[in-house]
Curated annotation (Swiss-Prot):
This is Putative F-box protein At5g62060. Pfam families: F-box (PF00646), FBA_3 (PF08268). PROSITE patterns: FBOX (PS50181). Residues 27-74 form the F-box domain. InterPro entries: F-box-assoc_dom_typ3, F-box-assoc_interact_dom, F-box-like_dom_sf, F-box_dom. It comes from Arabidopsis thaliana (Mouse-ear cress). It comes from the Eukaryota.
Length: 303
């Protein structure tokens, strides 16, 4: 028995030596890339890959998810090369004893891919009711606290719109939706929204689309506020909020193309940077609702 025990110990120790030798040879094949070069390489990767690569190591997870300069570079890159007609399709299923229905947001792109997101669960128990008219989800970023938040605004059916607001903070240990006070009641958001410098901006209506006003939601303080806006934005349905060189802007395209920019958030002063008539027909606009179809026909006449 002692002899067998000695042979067994010898085999184990020899195997360990071989593993150490193999491990040493394998390590010698790898190149030790400096951290600053690794960061620059990661900055070139798509956002989808960066999310996956957070699992490589704690160091990579910290770089990708917490380093301010790294996050700013990714945001700047996405602003320089924005994706065309991109949106997210979110589907939520609610079932009760009486009814079962689906709620979904509509994507603008025609190439739709339906995927599930592990870990992203919206618990609407106690909030979704039979009188629910609609709801919107808006993604925002607070550059001061370096936090990402999702704001959900629910609208119920009544003679006037009734609002309830909930906020979810990404990477919050509690992982729950918080009910926050909606400071502007009786309004219906008119998307798309835009997040600039820690504030979410969106157009809203309180009379089913007859007149509009501009609303801001401060991502850090989680408070709503009215924003002064030019008459063209208030009166026109055919306008879109944009991020214009880091400032809030909107494009109107009803009878002419115009771009307005809010120079200062505190003073809420606007200036018109583009004003061009399109009455001669050189530019043709298509309603975004028809882009969902496989084929779109544009008929025009050249004299």
């Amino acid at each position: 028995m002692k002899r067998r025990s000695k042979e067994s110990n010898y085999n184990i120790s020899s195997q360990r030596r071989r593993y150490r030798e193999i491990s040493t040879r394998e390590k010698s094949r790898y190149i030790d890339i400096p951290l600053d070069i690794t960061v620059e390489i990661l900055k070139k990767l798509p956002a989808k890959s960066l999310v996956r690569f957070q699992c490589v190591s704690k160091q990579w997870s910290t770089i990708i998810g917490s380093r301010r300069d790294f996050i700013d570079s990714i945001v700047a890159r996405s602003m320089t090369h924005p994706q065309q007609w991109w949106d997210v399709l979110l589907i939520f299923h609610y079932q009760s004893d009486k009814s079962s229905f689906f709620i979904f947001t509509h994507p603008l792109n025609t190439n739709q891919e339906l995927v599930s997101i592990p870990g992203l669960t919206v618990d609407c128990y106690g909030y979704i009711r039979d009188d629910l008219f609609n709801h919107v989800f808006v993604f925002g970023y607070d550059p001061v606290k370096n936090k990402y938040k999702v704001m959900c605004l629910m609208i119920t059916k009544s003679e006037e719109f009734e609002n309830a607001c909930f906020v979810f903070t990404l990477r919050d240990p509690k992982k729950q939706w918080r009910n926050v006070k909606c400071g502007i009641q009786h309004h219906y958001p008119w998307l798309p929204a835009v997040c600039i410098n820690g504030a979410i901006y969106y157009r809203a209506t309180e009379d089913h689309g007859s007149t509009f006003f501009l609303v801001s939601f401060d991502v850090r303080s989680e408070k709503f506020d009215h924003v002064n806006a030019p008459k063209e934005l208030i009166d026109s349905k055919d306008s879109t909020l944009i991020n214009y060189q880091g400032k809030l802007g909107f494009v109107s395209y009803e009878r002419s193309v115009g771009i307005w920019v809010m120079e200062d958030h505190n003073k809420q002063g606007w200036s018109k940077v583009v004003d061009s008539s399109i009455g001669s027909g050189e530019i043709v606009f298509i309603n975004k609702m028809v882009i969902c179809h496989d084929t779109v026909y544009v008929v025009f006449f050249l004299s």
